[in-house]
């Protein structure tokens, strides 16, 4: 075999090996995804609603309808600040969470005005069983979900809010409870795909329809907003390296689908 043929043969086999590794990597990446919502029932999920004990799904707030996980208030009278969260049963540390959502036209008028077309995904949260009956918000970080409130007025989705927590944004702890993303504004009945990428207590990325719209770092316990919590849980300055994921209910109807996660 000539030298040139040897080089070509070696290059060809190297190319095949690279293709093989790429294919293997793609398959492995796909196999890493775990579905969190089975489309049939709330297996693996635990509700915690303000004024109620952990595990009490008051008035069937969280339900499955036509394969979608729905936040619904059909069986409510007055809202009475029943801010709720549906927790997945397992905590996560470094992960990519992916889901799709859209709002419904249901909103309880006695809920706070800011809850209109507003929901969220909490992460790095305290465990649901540690949330006191009269504690309003879990100590956690929130990927806030918004839709248009007034036509033509920007209201980006994918923001960050911080009940009982702090984050570092643009090099310093940001004193604001919520930090706006660069995402567009969506109509309330549009399906939107969102992704949350978290590396323990280091970097957090918010993605909307595949675009990174917000990045911040060093999530930690601190700040205000959460009330009537167990002081033993809220130790300010504690890095949030892991925690629970939860879907929010705060007076606005919303539906979720294709909720899945992979650990990083």
Identify the role of each PLM range:
Residues 1-29:
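Bacterial Sec-dependent N-terminal signal peptides
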Residues 23-264:
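Carbohydrate-interacting regions of secretory-pathway proteins
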């Amino acid at each position: 075999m000539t030298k040139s043929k040897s080089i070509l043969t070696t290059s060809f086999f190297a190319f095949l090996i690279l293709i093989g590794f790429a294919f293997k990597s793609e398959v492995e990446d796909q196999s890493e995804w775990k579905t969190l919502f089975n489309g049939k029932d709330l297996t693996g999920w635990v509700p915690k609603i303000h004024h109620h004990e952990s595990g009490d799904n008051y008035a069937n707030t969280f339900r499955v309808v036509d394969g979608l996980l729905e936040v619904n208030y059909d069986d409510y009278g007055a809202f009475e600040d029943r801010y709720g969260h549906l927790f997945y049963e397992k905590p996560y540390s470094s992960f990519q969470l992916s889901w799709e959502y859209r709002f419904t036209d249901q909103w309880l008028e006695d809920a706070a005005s800011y809850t209109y077309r507003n929901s969220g995904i909490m992460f790095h949260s305290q465990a649901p069983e540690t949330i006191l009956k009269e504690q309003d918000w879990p100590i956690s970080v929130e990927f806030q979900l918004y839709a248009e409130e007034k036509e033509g007025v920007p209201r980006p989705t994918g923001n960050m809010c911080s009940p009982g927590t702090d984050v570092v944004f643009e090099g310093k702890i940001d004193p604001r409870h919520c930090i706006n993303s660069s995402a567009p504004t969506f109509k309330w009945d549009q399906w939107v795909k969102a992704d949350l990428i978290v590396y323990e207590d280091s970097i957090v990325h918010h993605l909307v329809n595949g675009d990174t719209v917000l990045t911040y770092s060093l999530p930690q316990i601190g700040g205000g907003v959460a009330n009537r919590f167990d002081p033993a849980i809220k130790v300010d300055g504690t890095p949030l390296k892991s925690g629970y994921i939860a879907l929010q209910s705060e007076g606005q109807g919303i539906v979720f689908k294709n909720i899945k996660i992979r650990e990083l």
